[in-house]
Amino acid sequence: MSGRDVAGSAVRRPSTLAAKARRPNLASAPRMQQSTNAQHRGRLPARIRISALGINRRLVPLSVLDDGSLEAPDRYADVGWWRHGPLPGSPGNAVVVGHVDSKTGPAVFYGLASLQRGDRVEVTRRNASPALFWVRRVERFPVKDFPADRVYRHGGPSGLVLITCGGKYDRAAGRYLDNVVVFASPVPHRSGLASK
C-alpha cells in the first residue's frame, strides 16, 4: 500500500487520495465476524512483531468502507488488522495491512516482499498468549487478479495474511499495479520454527 493510493486489492486509504486516482472495488472484504470477535475481546490482537524486518508495532483496527474495500491505516508507520475478520489463532485468515511507502520514503511494510519461507511473525493478543506464525510463501498479484477468496477466508485452518502494495507505480492512476501478499501458518509447538 502506498501513501499515494492504496487502491485495488480492497486495501486503500479512505481519505486524501489523489482526485484522479482510480478506485476499483476488485476484492471486497466480507462484512462478517462482528459478533464473534466481540465474544472473544480478550484475544484481540494488540501488536505485531516481524523480527526479520525489524517491525514491532501496535495493531490498529480497520473496517470495511462503504464500497466494500478494506480501509488502510491513517499513518504510514501503523499496521492495521481487519477487525471484522477472523482473529489471529482462530479458524480462517486474520488479515493485516500496512503501507509500502509514502511521499517521503519507505513505510512500515516496505520490506514485506523480502520475507523468506520460515520467517516468524508474532501477534501479541490481549489477555492471551501470543499467536506465532511462520511465512509459507510470498506472492505478488496484479490488482485485477487479487485472490479475495483465498485472502478473506473464514473457517478452515488458522492463518495470517499480510498485505501491502507492490509492483510498478502508475502515476497517471495514482496507485500501484500489484499487491504483495504474505501467507503465514501457525508455528507448530514442537517445530524448530518456534525458536526462529
Task: Tell where the protein language model's regions lie, with residue ranges.
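Solvent-exposed, non-transmembrane regions of membrane-associated and secreted proteins
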Residues: 2-117, 122-196
